[in-house]
Amino acid sequence: MSDFNAIAQQFTEFYYKTFDTDRAQLAPLYRENSMLTFEQSPFLGTANIVGKLQELPFQRIEHQVATVDAQPSNESGGILVVVSGALLVEEERRPMSYTQTFQLLPADGAYYVFNDVFRLVYPAA
């Protein structure tokens, strides 16, 4: 079994660094059967996913990852990655909390994002 924790950590660092600098460069991480659920809205396929990420209404963002948890997820070598953290958008001084879950599947000696679920986490009222 490969070191799923190391793979999850490397993936997470790459994903958020790329997201924060040039979201279009995330396209190779997805496939036509990949799905993103962004705040309850589903997007299927690379073009729709990257289109959604590029149309987000901000230019500058900084993800601050707090936790990365990973588990092997199936017999074919998939990895479930759960990330929590905070993000700063544009000139905001107060970070917003988020959680994001990725299902990584192996293909051609690498991994791609099969499932991606993003959710902002608001304080309890």
Curated annotation (Swiss-Prot):
GO terms for biological process: nucleocytoplasmic transport; protein transport. Facilitates protein transport into the nucleus. Could be part of a multicomponent system of cytosolic factors that assemble at the pore complex during nuclear import. Keywords: Allergen, Cytoplasm, Protein transport, Transport. It comes from the Eukaryota. InterPro entries: NTF2 (IPR045875), NTF2-like_dom_sf (IPR032710), NTF2_dom (IPR002075), Nuclear_transport_factor_2_euk (IPR018222). Its main location: cytoplasm. It is found in: Cytoplasm. SUPFAM superfamilies: NTF2-like. This is Nuclear transport factor 2. The lineage of its organism: Eukaryota, Fungi, Dikarya, Ascomycota, Pezizomycotina.
